[in-house]
Amino acid sequence: MEQFDDARPRLEKQYEQVQYDPASGLSPEALRQEFDAECARHPGEPRILTRARLMRLICEKARIAPEKDNFFASKVDGGGLFLQLRRQWGQEMWKKEFDFQPDGWCSMTDLKEHACHYCVDTSHTCPDWEALLTLGFPGLKRRAEQGGDTPFHRAAAMVCEGAAILCERLGRASDNPALEALAHRPPQTLHEAFQIALLYHDLQEMEGEEVRTMGWFDRLYLNFYRNDIAAGRLTRESAKELIKYFWIAFYAKWQGKRFGKNFCFGPEINELSMLALETYYELNTVDPKLSLLLTPETPQAFLELVARNIRDGRTAIVSLNYPLVVEGLIRHGRTPEDARRCIPVGCYEPAVFGREISCSGATHFFLPQAVALFLEEKGEYATFEELKQACFHRIAREIAYMEEQQRRCESIWPEINPAPLLSSTLADCIRKGRDITEGGAEYNSTACVVSYLPEAVDSLAAIEYLVYQEKLCTLDELRAALAADWKGFETLQLFARNRAPKWGNNDPAADRLAVELTRFVAPLINEAPNRRGGRFFASLYGQMVVERGRLIGALPDGRNAGTPVAKNLDACISMDRNGITALMESVVKLDLANFPCGTCLDLMLHPSAVQGDDGITAIAALIRTFLAEGGSGLQFNIFDVETLRDAQRHPENYRNLQVRVCGWNVRFTDLPPEAQQTFIDQAGAIAG
């Protein structure tokens, strides 16, 4: 096989330049005709069987792409039929349940009136990779057949049978013995294990559920690696080549312009952990991204290798506090044994591996918008304490509304996107005879991302300071300033921005409000039932800061309408005035185990602060200190403001400049100017 460095330009474009063999199967048009005929032969059957028939039809008869110059083959031309079917059913069910058609899958219409967002979340899933690697497609088919004869069991067996047939077809077309073997048995080598994982990934995403974690890399593949080394099939260097061929496929699919493909490492660190982090450094790409489950016992050598990646611009890495993650999961209903088998799904949202469907992007609650809605009520309050309690009451009311709307979403999920392939990997689904959309997993959670805490805290702190402490304005005057987007109230805005307490500075007044607000909100979410026999599941971070900021009006903290909001648990943009230690001190005052679906802090460092070996040691020490003090998740950006400004002016010179955007990385030059400016402003603030 061609050396990776020579093949890389071609491999990076492999999903853009797919060459399907016309003679290998049916065109999308012919496939559609055959599917329509198949549906006509089975009128009125459960929709999960309809989707299973479509998967098997595609696997058996769709065109495929021979890939003789790649270690891995997985490309089959499904013709967009799954997406068409999901849209058809989605439009029907949304109209039936809600009497409106949403923009895509999600309803954003309630953000302004109810400070929330809800959706049918098919984008945050984790299959049981252990079952796939242990049983293979034939074994999963047998397990489904032995589990029962319900429509669900038949559908699960059908899709696994189709996947095995596709292995045979792709293997023959690509001269790939690994694929041909996988048609009949589970993987036995590292090459075969990577191959079945990639093919499964592509099939599940075609089915309609985004794979948001590829599992524990250094646990799932360790024995395959060790056996190949012992048998002489691989050397350390040839294993690196194989990993690069595998990982670059995930970059190639979206070109680094989506949310990143997550591979997890830890908490136990081994020789494959070290090899993979070395390979990641050499690969130097925005995707895949790495999630690290760290403990006080994490070896220093591993942590310094992580720090070297971060210091040198490979920042698509989040460090997670494994003991705290486990504590949060146990506190909120998982058994200790299950909690210890956690996996970050998506950005940094823990779930129980192989037993939980967490839907970690299902709902969002926008705290500062709720504060703004409360102010619009035009109530009068003699004390700040009275105002705060009334504001909390409005927040509770809107959270209850959001939860009820989400339960309605989940009631139609089985009729929109039943998931026989994903469900076939989960033993609990097979045991119960139920798809994931109907509560087939052991833990059926619905996450709520509690977003933009910094703006909410700073807004409440500003109200207390401006109205009740310094008496610089009345509530009605503050409302008038917000309605005018601070025009004509510029002096008051300066007091709000520069004198009122700010989150992220270890300020007791602001941090007290953050503790009170999070302590109030968490049980409203974590104790609420969902529609699938589980509960809601709180996380605490903020993403899409430019896009969501456009939808949020002026706020009491001095923020203008439509401007970007804070990422994750960071201070509001340019408001972290006391350095990173103060920022971390603010964060660790919160009881983050009450947000078991994940939280994260972003740190931006100037390159001069992390130069040389001492810089690597400093980053490693920051990670250890933050996690030891009770932080949950930590990630970094390291650059100076002049580099970013020059990249804006001369993007052709900075094609490999990565930035960490909430829970994933992108190339800086791929960001729109407004998003670029948020990084420039933050970098300018730390430069002084």
Q: Model-derived features: where do they sit?
A:
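Extended, non-transmembrane alpha-helical coiled-coils
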Residues: 162-165, 169
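Conserved catalytic cores of very large enzyme subunits
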Residues: 1-156, 166, 178-185, 189-688
